[in-house]
């Protein structure tokens, strides 16, 4: 327990906040090149084949990023934009690829939450 005089002289040390997406180095997004595109199985209660990509970022760091949405056009050497955000049931996946930016096309046929999947507004059909 510090004395009052010690607190006046030195103050308390602020706790450092640890980044949840360190590879982005404080940037909101980073550009990268897909090194490998593959599927992984999620943790225990869930079952699926989740689409992920190993991405080498423009700062040289290599990360595993999740590809959201149904279907994608990504392959090796595709250039993508990566943002922070983990996938709870995939251990070690702490980044997501932004759909509709650079080489990652938007999700086809998406009608709701389109902005999150890079989908353009659908054409209005003539209603009878």
UniProtKB/Swiss-Prot annotation:
The keyword Secreted does not apply. It comes from the Bacteria. The keyword Ribonucleoprotein applies. The modification 3-methylthioaspartic acid is found at residue 89. GO terms for cellular component: ribosome; small ribosomal subunit. GO terms for biological process: translation. Residues 1-24, 105-128 are annotated as: Disordered. Keywords: Methylation, Ribonucleoprotein, Ribosomal protein, RNA-binding, rRNA-binding, tRNA-binding. One of its GO terms (molecular function) is structural constituent of ribosome. Pfam families: Ribosom_S12_S23 (PF00164). Belongs to the universal ribosomal protein uS12 family. HAMAP family: Ribosomal_uS12_B. Part of the 30S ribosomal subunit. Contacts proteins S8 and S17. May interact with IF1 in the 30S initiation complex. With S4 and S5 plays an important role in translational accuracy. Interacts with and stabilizes bases of the 16S rRNA that are involved in tRNA selection in the A site and with the mRNA backbone. Located at the interface of the 30S and 50S subunits, it traverses the body of the 30S subunit contacting proteins on the other side and probably holding the rRNA structure together. The combined cluster of proteins S8, S12 and S17 appears to hold together the shoulder and platform of the 30S subunit. This is Small ribosomal subunit protein uS12.
